[in-house]
Amino acid sequence: MRAAVAHRILLSLALFAVLCRCDPDLLFDYCVADTAAATAAGAFHLNGLACIDPALARADHFATSALSRATNPAATLYGFNATLTSPAASLPGANAQGLAMARIDLAPGGMAPPHSHPRASEAALVLSGSVLVGFADTSYRLYTQLLRAGEAFVFPRAMVHFLYNMDTAAPAVVLSGLNSQSPGAQLVPFSAFRTEPRLPDEVLKKAFKITGQDVQRIQKHLGGL
């Protein structure tokens, strides 16, 4: 009897694990996004966009130049810009494939501040520059590595991580791959100080051991006031 119960529990856990994968598997070879349907008023929000007729698919649906264009991150709050591929805008052939790519431009001394991707793991490859990367796990252990051009690093799914251009004279460029077409991004500073509506000041004061004036100052510096 106990063996039968244990078997049912293990089977249930196995099925649950399958259902909790990042993105669902395709039932076809590909599902090129119908970008017209994606922008239509009242369009449904799905894990992936509606597909066009496979007979209408073209090679350029599976190609993009979106990541070839450099951006100027110098004027941004943290000195970084991230360009993410999107089935609706730049890479319709990636629809429902469970992946996205990103180009991160880092100004000299710029940083992608501590953040997480709740729905994806990330593999980051440095194309140019010297970039200090790292993540903290759920036991608050920190893993860091200084990467140079041609070197890569993996950020496990949902772990808080950062990328910091150590060079104060030259920019850096990083190319990332993520195993979800909708990885999400949650910046830690904004999650604490830029929510709408705002977190209560008392919560922030107690959590960070700061004063009410500190809360106001940080919110102002983050452009939240």
Swiss-Prot record:
Please state which protein family the record places this protein in: Belongs to the germin family.
The job of this chain, per UniProt, is described as: May play a role in plant defense. Probably has no oxalate oxidase activity even if the active site is conserved.
PANTHER family, sorted: GERMIN-LIKE PROTEIN SUBFAMILY 3 MEMBER 3 (PTHR31238)
GO cellular component, alphabetical, reads: apoplast
Q: What are the residue boundaries of the Cupin type-1 domain, all occurrences included? A: 65-216
Alphabetized UniProt keyword annotations: Apoplast, Disulfide bond, Glycoprotein, Manganese, Metal-binding, Secreted, Signal
Gene3D superfamilies noted in UniProt: Jelly Rolls
Q: Which residues bind Mn(2+) per the record?
A: H115, H117, E122, H161
Instruction: List the glycosylation sites.
Output: N81
Disulphide bond pairs = C31-C51
What are the GO MF terms of this UniProt record? manganese ion binding
Localization, per the record, is: Secreted, Extracellular space, Apoplast
Signal sequence span is 1-22
**Record text on subunit structure and interactions:** Oligomer (believed to be a pentamer but probably hexamer).
For this entry, the protein name equals Germin-like protein 3-1
